[in-house]
Amino acid sequence: MLASGENVNILVLDTEVYSNTGGQSSKSTPAGAIAKFAASGKKIRKKDLGMMAMSYGYVYVAQVAMGANPVQYLNAIKEAEAYDGPSLIIAYAPCINHGLKAGMGLSQKEEKLAVECGYWHLYRFNPELEGTDKNPFSLDSKEPDWSKFQDFLKGEVRFASLYKLFPERADELLQRTEEFAKIRLESYKKLAGK
C-alpha cells in the first residue's frame, strides 16, 4: 500500500506479536521476548518498520506512544492527515500477551516507561520538508534513562519469564535487547543530525 504512492493513512498498533491469532512471535517481536514460536526468547532484533517505510523517500512516517507524549501523538496524526501521499503511524500498543505485571489498566503508563527508558523512541519523518531549511526527521524522544531499561523489561512477563525458564541465558538476551534499542536510537540521532 505504501509503495502505491496513494494518499492513504495507515495506523499500526504495534503489539510486537501476532496478537489476533494468539501471540505468536513476529518480525516485530523484540529480542529476548518469549512468544509462541520463540519459547526460549527471540534471539534476533525486530524489524524497524518505520525505517523500512522511510526508505521509500515519499512516505510520511511517525512512531508514537500516546501515553508517553500525547502532544507528539496528535501532531503526528495531524501531519499524516495533511500529507498528500501515503502515511504510516506506528503506535506502541501494550497488549495482554506482554503480561504487564502492573496490569493492562496501566498500559498508558507502560507506554511512558517504554519511552523514558529507551525501549521505544518517538519520531516523525515528513518528506515535504526535504529541500527546505528544516530536517525532515524529528527525533521527539528525550535522551533515555538507560538505568531503567532492564527494570522495564522485567515488568513484563514476556521478558521476565526468561529468568524462570532459561536463567542461564536471560541476562544475555535482555542485555541484547537493550543494545538493539541503543543501536536504533543512534540511527535515529544520525537522521536528526544530532
Where are these regions (language model features)?
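Metallocofactor- and cofactor-centric catalytic cores in central/energy metabolism, strongly enriched
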Residues: 20, 76-80, 104, 136, ...
